[in-house]
């Protein structure tokens, strides 16, 4: 089963996440099929905190990929941010 989820990168006390498409059997930070965006929760600049490729997310949803709960929340947040701009 293919999932859209967050992979943890960064260093100690400085988390950085990549939103990726990966097989559910792969480890959290292991192999992935495609990178869809990134999320930096400790960024000082509001514009660079969250970047996503919505076209590719819709493509993978159409292929049957399941989205993790946290990824769904971030996609909704990104959509709100895009609507206000």
Swiss-Prot record:
Q: Which UniProt keywords apply?
A: Ribonucleoprotein, Ribosomal protein
Q: Name one GO cellular component term.
A: small ribosomal subunit
Nucleotide-binding: present as a keyword of the record? no
What Pfam family is a match, any one? Ribosomal_S16
Highest taxon in the source lineage: Bacteria
The molecular function GO annotations come to: structural constituent of ribosome
A biological-process GO annotation: translation
The record, for Gene3D superfamilies, names:
3.30.1320.10
According to its UniProt record, which protein family does this protein belong to? Belongs to the bacterial ribosomal protein bS16 family.
Return the protein name: Small ribosomal subunit protein bS16
Q: Which organism is it from?
A: Buchnera aphidicola subsp. Schizaphis graminum (strain Sg)
Instruction: Quote the gene name from the UniProt entry.
Output: rpsP
């Amino acid at each position: 089963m293919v999932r859209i989820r967050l992979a943890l990168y960064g260093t100690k006390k400085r988390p950085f996440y990549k939103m990726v498409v990966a097989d559910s059997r792969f480890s959290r930070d292991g192999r992935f099929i495609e990178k869809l965006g990134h999320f930096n929760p400790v960024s000082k600049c509001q514009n660079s905190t969250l970047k996503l490729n919505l076209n590719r997310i819709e493509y993978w949803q159409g292929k049957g990929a399941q989205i993790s709960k946290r990824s769904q929340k971030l996609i909704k947040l990104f959509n709100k941010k895009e609507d206000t701009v």
